[in-house]
């Protein structure tokens, strides 16, 4: 079985919308050089929608870097339920 390469990265608590746009433009350009590599990014939750929109049509996948361990909604201040994403 052939092994494949996957590269993933997250922002931690860095960046702005402008920073993201610039970073993603460069990433989309560079990823084209490596078509056999799967790439995924995990921005902070507040940027997921904008990042996903900018990456429409590219092979780069988008995910969340933090998800609450709770399975049901509730009063968990600062947490993000997986279903909310």
For each predicted feature, which ranges?
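Well-formed, non-transmembrane alpha-helical positions, independent of function
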Residues: 83-84
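Conserved N-terminal beta1-alpha1 strand-loop-helix module at the mouth
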Residues: 1-80
């Amino acid at each position: 079985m052939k092994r494949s390469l996957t590269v993933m990265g997250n922002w931690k608590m860095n960046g702005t919308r402008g920073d993201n746009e610039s970073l993603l433009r460069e990433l989309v350009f560079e990823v084209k050089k490596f078509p056999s590599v799967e790439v995924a990014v995990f921005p902070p939750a507040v940027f997921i929608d904008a990042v996903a929109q900018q990456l429409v049509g590219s092979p780069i996948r988008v995910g969340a870097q933090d998800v609450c361990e709770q399975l049901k909604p509730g009063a968990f201040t600062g947490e993000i339920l997986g279903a909310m994403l």
